[in-house]
């Protein structure tokens, strides 16, 4: 009963906050400057990570680029240097905790305190539970989730000490809405979204107001990791479009970025719709891509 009374007493605040949010829709938020900030991007040798590096280079940030692919990393670094940025590269296996901690130690000693951390590195296996090998499941969680813990533990203390920083989690719409035959990937991205939300709340509980958090949750992106993707929610997203939205979200300090925005509506529907209706709705959305179905192979 006391809890219900407390909720009722908060209704005036709910009305004020709702009006405030509505008004903000029509007032563009000022973008912050990232000139001179030390920005570390994991998975910078390809796709979203590479394009994000280009955008920070244009904004005169100092770049620290990590990737397991040395050739891709060097290509990204060369373009960023051509844009006038100072660039440092490290070949890092984000599935290896000790590799992450070792590289982080070098970054802090040789370059300085990272003030913007973009946890972008990721892997995906398009297969059902039976066709996904145990090492693939382990690697999915090591790269897509656990690496976020290790990088954040390495670089967040300095941000908290300075009360200045930004942790960016590149997740997925699959971190909010489940997709068959992406079991390991969806599970890891649900965990990544949970990491972002809980880290945000921990920082608030500790009254660390200067360290911001942003989570990116796009639909299928045309980066080549998933073959022949399609969905009735819209066309496959181009990396440039996603990175433009990501940069806007970082610079305006948005907490959650859904691309397309209809994903946010879908996540709300999933919580309130009857299960039977929701099952029909998911079939209508018609998510398709090339996948290996191990269950059928076992049955043959």
Curated annotation (Swiss-Prot):
Gene3D superfamilies: NAD(P)-binding Rossmann-like Domain (3.40.50.720). NADP(+) binds at residues 40-64. CDD domains: 17beta-HSDXI-like_SDR_c (cd05339). Its EC number is 1.1.1.62. One of its GO terms (cellular component) is lipid droplet. GO terms for molecular function: estradiol 17-beta-dehydrogenase [NAD(P)+] activity. It is found in: Endoplasmic reticulum; Lipid droplet. Coiled coil: none annotated. One of its GO terms (biological process) is steroid biosynthetic process. It catalyses: 17beta-estradiol + NAD(+) = estrone + NADH + H(+); 17beta-estradiol + NADP(+) = estrone + NADPH + H(+). Substrate binds at residue 172. InterPro entries: NAD(P)-bd_dom_sf, SDR_fam. Keywords: Endoplasmic reticulum, Lipid biosynthesis, Lipid droplet, Lipid metabolism, NADP, Oxidoreductase, Signal, Steroid biosynthesis. The active site is at residue 185. Residues 1-19 form the signal peptide. Its main location: endoplasmic reticulum. Belongs to the short-chain dehydrogenases/reductases (SDR) family. 17-beta-HSD 3 subfamily. Can convert androstan-3-alpha,17-beta-diol (3-alpha-diol) to androsterone in vitro, suggesting that it may participate in androgen metabolism during steroidogenesis. May act by metabolizing compounds that stimulate steroid synthesis and/or by generating metabolites that inhibit it. Has no activity toward DHEA (dehydroepiandrosterone), or A-dione (4-androste-3,17-dione), and only a slight activity toward testosterone to A-dione. This is Estradiol 17-beta-dehydrogenase 11. It comes from Pongo abelii (Sumatran orangutan).
